[in-house]
From Swiss-Prot:
It is a multi-pass membrane protein. It comes from the Bacteria. It is found in: Cell inner membrane. Keywords: Cell inner membrane, Cell membrane, Membrane, Symport, Transmembrane, Transmembrane helix, Transport. The chain crosses the membrane at residues 4-24, 44-64, 76-96, 142-162, 184-204, 222-242, 289-309, 326-346, 352-372. GO terms for biological process: L-aspartate transmembrane transport. The gene is dctA. Signal peptide: none annotated. This is C4-dicarboxylate transport protein. GO terms for molecular function: fumarate transmembrane transporter activity; malate:proton symporter activity; succinate transmembrane transporter activity. PROSITE patterns: NA_DICARBOXYL_SYMP_1 (PS00713), NA_DICARBOXYL_SYMP_2 (PS00714). SUPFAM superfamilies: Proton glutamate symport protein (SSF118215). GO terms for cellular component: plasma membrane. InterPro entries: C4_dicarb_transport, Na-dicarboxylate_symporter, Na-dicarboxylate_symporter_CS, Na:dicarbo_symporter_sf.
Length: 428
């Protein structure tokens, strides 16, 4: 039993995170130097994301009997994303107004270091709904795979899957090759995941070593408020959605616990994307649904990021005494409904979208971003964890709505009555 525990990825990642925190706290300079370990692991994951999405989506779509089902799945997914992410934005807005974590700080924007956020502000200028939509179309197929742009790869994979389906029996050989290639790719993922403890250790040691636990104290009220809001969102909102769909949110969280720990260590929900594709399919969701919902959700269904954006924007207003009446807050909400869709599931993207939103609203001082620049990295974990759980729940919900969910398999796996519910831990 003890040997099995030590070999489990869950235990190894958890231990690595704890060691990383201790190293970063007691030896901050050494901890800060561990950054390449975390970066290398995330890069290895990103290396494999494009082929995983391509194989999953192509085989899922080409293997379907009707192409109408694909369109229906996409429409249902986008509707769900819009509804739930809007709820997340509103919840963040309500709680930050009730708790008011920035009230009483009386910060003069003129005293803030605007240079510290200049890079993010410059990147934010490139954000926009037209630019975002145009960026979905790749300049070339090779370019889409080379850059690892999830939506570009997804677009090409959907078109390829449709074309392959239309070939019928003539395309069977290509289908078999891609399916075999998919098995090889998931084999590579299993090898990469063996390095997850090292990546989690490096990323956590760097975070604590560079920013220090002390940086949490000054703006701790915002951090605590944000974490509690994310927990409430997962338990109450996603929990209710899960219950209506027919499963327990707590059992689901237990099922993806390894992926959650990897995300906690790397602070990027993207690092768990390949494994989520595999685990959601083994949970009873059809491959075509998983292939469409999970990758799309990484741009359109970032619940944690949505909560963060409203709370951070209003916090800056409160801290700098920039009065926001109901009209300003509604304007903020409308802008965020658009700008939040441009955030990807990678570290730092939420802060860039926040900069874009504040610039677009115009009522808030952009220099106010400097207030949360130092603690943004600590809030990134809660964003990423909430995003991951949200996309997992979305996949099950959409699969049920389009009648592509194996309810018996879902129940068996979550209740450990099937082998799939026990064999996903990687040990070595």
């Amino acid at each position: 039993m003890k040997t099995s525990l030590f070999k489990s990825l869950y235990f190894q990642v958890l231990t690595a995170i704890a060691i990383g925190i201790l190293l970063g706290h007691y030896y901050p300079e050494l901890g800060a130097q561990m950054k390449p370990l975390g970066d290398a692991f995330v890069k290895l994951i990103k290396m494999i994301i494009a082929p995983v999405i391509f194989c999953t989506v192509v085989t899922g779509i080409a293997g379907m009997e009707s192409m109408k089902a694909v369109g229906r799945t996409g429409a249902v997914a986008l509707l769900y994303f819009e509804i739930v992410s809007t709820i997340a934005l509103i919840i963040g807005l309500i709680i930050v107004n009730v708790v008011q974590p920035g009230a009483g700080m009386n910060v003069d924007p003129a005293t803030l270091d605007a240079q510290a956020v200049a890079v993010y502000a410059a990147q934010a200028k490139e954000q926009g709904i037209i630019a975002f939509l145009m960026d979905v179309i790749p300049g070339s197929v090779i370019g889409a795979f080379a850059s690892g742009n999830i939506l570009q790869v997804l677009l090409f994979a959907v078109l390829f899957g449709f074309a392959l389906h239309r070939l019928g029996s003539k395309g069977q050989l290509i289908f078999n090759v891609i399916e075999s290639f998919s098995q090889v790719i998931f084999g590579i993922i299993n090898m990469i995941m063996r390095l997850a403890p090292i990546g989690a250790f490096g990323a956590m040691a760097f975070t604590i070593g560079k920013y220090g636990v002390g940086s949490l104290v000054q703006l701790g009220q915002l951090i605590i408020c944000f974490y509690i809001t994310c927990i409430l969102f997962v338990v109450v909102v996603l929990g209710t959605i899960a219950r209506v769909t027919g499963f327990s949110i707590f059992k689901f969280i237990r099922y993806i616990r390894e992926e959650l720990l990897i995300v906690l260590g790397t602070s990027s929900s993207e690092s768990a994307l390949p494994r989520m594709l595999d685990k959601m399919e083994k949970l009873g969701c059809r491959k075509s649904v998983v292939g469409l919902v999970i990758p799309t959700g990484y741009s359109f269904n970032l619940d944690g990021t949505s909560i963060y954006l409203t709370m951070a924007a209003v916090f800056i207003a409160q801290a700098t005494n920039s009065h926001m009446d109901i009209f300003h807050q509604i304007t903020l909400l409308v802008v965020l409904l658009l700008s939040s869709k441009g955030a990807a599931g990678v570290t730092g993207s939420g802060f860039i979208v926040l900069a874009a939103t504040i610039s677009a609203v115009g009522h808030l001082p952009v220099a106010g971003l400097a207030l949360i620049l130092g603690i943004d990295r600590f809030m990134s974990e809660a964003r990423a964890l909430t995003n991951l759980v949200g996309n997992g729940v979305a996949t099950v919900v959409v699969a049920k709505w389009v009648k592509e969910l194996d309810h018996q398999k879902l129940d068996d796996v979550l209740n450990n009555r099937a082998p799939d519910g026990k064999t996903h831990e990687i040990s070595f």
